[in-house]
């Protein structure tokens, strides 16, 4: 197996980060797909668990129940104050974001984030992945929603979220900058500063530092500033169109005019932009490549001649890989009636692990597997390759774009340019 050029802080699969497999080890526990079955497994076997394993199981159950929105179950397992490992803490922050953005459980988010911030302050919880600012931003926004304005203002002022969002390299975790801007705008709006919030979100959408959850926030703030929501849809579309055109012109320069095989993909060196690193090697036509779907059925890529085909290479432990999926989902939805196909191709990992990960997330995209990395010898994830209807490579790109909307704009532009130049 070739060594990956990691666009990661955390290497290997999520399971590789956990307690070694034992008879009742955490790895076995994590391979149970449904949290309901995990709960049953734990309660049937807890008497046989060592203290360390019992803690790991409780932490895993707390995270997974929270991700599902079952606060009663979460509270039950959190009551013992389990110690979270690195992956569990990361997943905990994702679950809290989901609780805020989708479930709108603001009181619970305010309470839970405050508890974890207190633990971080006392040193009983460790933030090894730099996500404390997410807890602070969520706490601020939740308090703003609850009318606790002074607490919200104090928390957002002390958060490192602005600094993290302003960093030149914020393309690791999903929607880092856009989430911060959304929560900052929520606080400013509640604090009687709707114009600041309006300008913040206008700029965010114009520059593609945006995601779908921000639309509702922006519409509420638009009504505060303009007196009604009349004209909002048109205004938002104008900002989104401006952002798309910007990335269309950037992407246009990446078009592969002469896609002769063999073709080596490259990416700029992170610290030496004038140097390039190889990311994949394409040395055979699509018709000679067959990969397995997640159900084990073979898929010959040559069957997609006549369609624009996108292959995105990923692994379960690659955080930016999975962060990009939300943008891909928007593209797939837009082209569902077109001659278009997108696969996310998992590398290096066995089918069982990928199936559990895909079900739990859930991953809504079609998955293929290349466990031995034979098709394109990929050396950097995430990497995507776009083929024209004749099977020629027309675009390739590595890395996560930094926001759901920017990822969507960039891939959509690649699809549109490929379509228009190959009619």
Protein language model annotation of sequence segments:
Residues 18-25, 49-60, 84-97, 127-138, ...:
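Generic helix N-cap/helix-start motif at coil->alpha-helix transitions
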Residues 28-43, 63-77, 102-119, 148-164:
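Helix-turn-helix repeat elements of alpha-solenoid scaffolds
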Residues 39-55, 78-88, 102, 118-130, ...:
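Flexible helix-coil transition and linker loops at the boundaries of alpha-helical arrays
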Residues 210-288, 302-304, 356:
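N-proximal helix/coil linker or "cap" segments that precede and/or mark the start of modular domains
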Residues 288-309, 334-335:
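A short beta-strand-turn-helix
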Residues 305-306, 313-330:
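Conserved redox-active cysteine motifs that mediate thiol-disulfide chemistry
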Residues 322-361, 370-375:
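Structural microenvironment flanking redox-active thiols in thiol-disulfide oxidoreductases
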Residues 357-363, 370-417:
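Thiol/disulfide oxidoreductase modules built on the thioredoxin-like
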């Amino acid at each position: 197996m070739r060594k990956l050029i990691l666009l990661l802080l955390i290497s290997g699969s999520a399971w590789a980060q956990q307690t070694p497999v034992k008879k009742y080890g955490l790895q076995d526990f994590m391979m149970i797909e449904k949290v309901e079955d995990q709960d049953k497994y734990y309660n049937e076997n807890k008497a046989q668990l060592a203290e360390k394993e019992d803690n790991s199981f409780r932490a895993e159950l707390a995270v997974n129940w929270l991700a599902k929105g079952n606060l009663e179950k979460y509270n039950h397992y959190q009551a013992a104050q389990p110690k979270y490992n690195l992956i569990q803490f990361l997943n905990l922050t994702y679950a809290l974001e989901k609780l805020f953005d989708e479930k709108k459980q603001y009181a619970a988010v305010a309470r839970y984030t405050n508890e974890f911030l207190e633990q971080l302050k006392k040193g009983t919880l460790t933030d090894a992945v730099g996500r404390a600012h997410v807890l602070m931003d969520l706490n601020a926004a939740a308090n703003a929603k609850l009318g606790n304005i002074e607490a919200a203002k104090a928390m957002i002022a002390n958060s490192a979220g602005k600094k993290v969002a302003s960093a030149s390299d914020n393309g690791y975790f999903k929607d880092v900058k856009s989430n911060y801007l959304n929560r900052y705008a929520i606080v400013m709006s509640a604090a009687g500063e709707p114009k600041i919030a309006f300008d913040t979100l206008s700029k965010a959408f114009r520059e593609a530092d945006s995601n779908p959850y921000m639309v509702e926030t922006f519409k509420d703030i638009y009504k505060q500033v303009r007196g009604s929501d009349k004209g909002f849809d048109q205004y938002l579309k104008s900002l989104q169109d401006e952002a798309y055109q910007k990335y269309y012109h950037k992407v246009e320069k990446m078009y592969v005019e002469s896609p002769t095989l063999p073709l080596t993909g490259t990416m700029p060196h992170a610290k030496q932009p004038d140097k390039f690193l190889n990311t994949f090697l394409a040395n055979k036509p699509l018709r000679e490549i067959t990969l397995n779907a997640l159900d084990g059925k073979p898929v010959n890529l040559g069957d997609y001649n006549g369609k624009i085909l996108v292959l995105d290479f990923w692994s379960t432990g690659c955080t930016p890989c999975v962060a990009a999926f939300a943008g891909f989902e928007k593209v797939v939805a837009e082209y569902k009636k077109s001659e278009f196909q997108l696969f996310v191709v998992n590398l290096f990992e066995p089918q069982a692990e990928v199936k559990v990960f895909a079900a739990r997330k859930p991953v809504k995209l079609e998955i293929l597997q290349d466990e031995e990395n034979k098709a394109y010898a990929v050396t950097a994830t995430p990497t995507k390759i776009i083929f024209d209807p004749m099977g020629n490579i027309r675009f390739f790109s590595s890395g996560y774009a930094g926001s759901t909307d920017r990822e969507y704009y960039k891939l959509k532009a690649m699809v549109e340019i490929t379509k228009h130049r190959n009619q």
